[in-house]
Design a protein with these regions (language model features):
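Glycine-rich, often proline-containing surface loops adjacent to acidic residues and nearby aromatics
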Residues: 147-150, 176-182, 272
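N-terminal targeting or regulatory segments adjacent to alpha/beta-hydrolase or S9 domains
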Residues: 1-150
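Short beta-strand segments that buttress and anchor functional surface loops
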Residues: 149-157
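Gly/Ala-rich beta-loop-alpha elbow adjacent to hydrolase catalytic centers
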Residues: 269-278
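Alpha/beta-hydrolase active-site loop
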Residues: 224-261
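Residue in the alpha/beta-hydrolase core beta-strand immediately N-terminal to the catalytic nucleophile
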Residues: 265-267
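Short, surface-exposed "cap/lid" segments of acyl-processing enzymes
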Residues: 157-224
Length: 279
């Protein structure tokens, strides 16, 4: 929550204290100012690395596979460094005094306004458009296991109305591999941290192509004043409704892409929130 507040504050000490809901003291203001200054430097570095990644992997320029690997390593290093500002913020010693979430619980009327129209025909929530969104494939590079690349497409759900990014791990020398669309847990941002347990490496070595979509409000889809996954909980009960209704449509796009790019079977799975989405 303190990290999300720093994102929203944009370097402003006053905005930071307003975000966390605590009164400022002169001593604490000085410490917060120094941390926010470093926070913005790391944010800028991460944005620059991410912009370079976007241009290299999804742009039209000629980039060697070695350069792509270096650009991806730089992106991940900078994002991990930016995410790690959480530990710096903890040194303020105020984490126990603030709410773990920025609550925005909707009223019954607000939820009803959005969902009452679907009560008679709930299937409409899960109906895909006649024309599925175009899926863009990035350039590829050799990862720790298999060939790695990303897919991007506009979410077909009006509940999120943003761009979905999914990382693909494709096994080597396997014609028409089976595909597993694998969802991550809540608050898990597998594509933005170093040192996480790789849940799919063994599957790729066994010849399975794994697609890992970023869930709504996680990773590249995180709102500017939130941390990854916060909105799912903080806006309950609407958050879970919106998430699952959107994710089902997004996974359907990935199922279609999988079937068009391989004759192998397609399976759904995941951990925690990802497992619930698969069900």
């Amino acid at each position: 929550r303190m990290w999300a507040a720093a994102r929203a504050a944009g370097g402003s000490v006053d905005k930071y204290f307003a975000e966390i809901g605590l009164p400022a003291t002169p001593a604490l203001e000085k410490r917060v100012a120094l941390i926010l200054q470093e926070f913005e430097v790391r944010r800028d570095h991460s944005k620059l690395a991410d912009d370079n990644w976007q241009d290299a992997f999804f742009g039209d320029g000629n980039v060697t596979t070695e350069q792509l690997l270096g650009i991806e390593q730089a992106r991940l290093d900078c994002r991990h460094h930016f995410n790690s500002m959480r530990s710096k913020l903890l040194t303020l010693g105020i984490s126990q005094k603030i709410s773990a979430l920025k609550w925005q619980v909707p009223t019954l009327e607000e939820v009803s306004t959005s969902y009452d129209k679907w009560l008679e025909r709930p299937i409409e929530l899960f109906e895909l458009p006649e024309n599925l969104p175009e899926v863009t494939k990035s350039k590829t590079f050799q990862g720790t296991v298999g060939t790695n690349y990303w897919l991007r497409f506009q979410s077909p759900s009006t509940l999120t109305n943003d761009v979905v990014t999914a990382r693909v791990y494709e096994p080597e020398n396997v014609k028409n591999p089976p595909t597993l669309i694998y969802g991550h847990g809540i608050c898990v941002e597998y594509d933005h941290w170093r040192g996480l347990i790789d849940e799919v490496e063994a599957l790729v070595k066994m010849g399975v192509r794994v697609i890992r979509p970023e869930a709504p409000w996680h990773g590249r889809r995180t709102p500017h004043d939130r941390f990854g996954g916060e909105q799912f909980i903080a806006t309950s009960p609407r958050g879970p409704f919106d998430h699952f209704c959107a994710a089902v449509l997004e996974w359907a796009v990935l199922i279609d892409w999988s079937r068009n790019s391989s004759t192998g079977p397609v399976a759904l799975g995941g951990t925690s929130l990802g497992s619930m989405t698969a069900h």
